[in-house]
From Swiss-Prot:
The gene is SEC11. Its EC number is 3.4.21.89. This is Signal peptidase complex catalytic subunit SEC11. Disulfide bonds: none annotated. Coiled coil: none annotated.
């Protein structure tokens, strides 16, 4: 098992292989960000506020529209609130104005009230710059791994330990 540690060249090759896997995943993420024009092209639904359209744990694919394709009422968007890190997935229920100056009001399908309480202090509506992207597709329950890792931090340690162990004992 630990014989690979006795050969420094093999250990270095395994470390490089692991680094290459991580850098490839990072490059794919950044490439997807550029292609979709979204800083976060994939998000996970963290709550039940969009049921029945989307369930907790669904993985959403986003596309950030340009100026010529305006966000429409009824469209599901993902937005960030100033001062908070968690993206929110909700439907546009009202729109005031057009173009870059349009103001949007959102609401979760499973919520009784609109999102004005979720917006930043002094903000009554969303603006175009708040939108991360519009939902163009989803994979049901694929994002549950992310939720489990967030709710149970010890799972991250276990997963990283297993990955590290696999790198050490891998034979070529």
């Amino acid at each position: 098992m630990l014989s690979s540690l006795q050969n420094p060249r093999q250990a270095a090759a395994q470390l490089m292989n692991f680094a290459m896997i991580l850098s490839t995943a990072f490059m794919m993420w950044k490439g997807l960000s550029v292609a979709t024009d979204s800083p976060s092209p994939i998000v996970v639904v963290l709550s039940g506020s969009m049921e029945p359209a989307f369930q907790r744990g669904d993985l959403l694919l986003l596309w950030n529209r340009n100026v010529w394709q305006e966000t429409a009422v009824g469209e599901v968007v993902v937005y960030n609130v100033k001062g908070k890190d968690i993206p929110i997935v909700h439907r546009v229920v009202r729109k005031f104005g057009t173009g870059d100056k349009a103001k949007l009001l959102t609401k979760g399908d499973n919520n009784n009230a609109d999102d004005t309480d979720l917006y930043a202090r002094g903000q009554d509506y969303l603006e175009r710059e708040d939108i991360i992207g519009s939902v163009i597709g989803y994979f049901p329950f694929v994002g549950y791994v992310t939720i489990l890792l967030s709710e149970h931090p010890w799972l991250k340690t276990v997963m990283l330990g297993i990955m590290g162990l696999l790198v050490v004992i891998q034979r070529e």
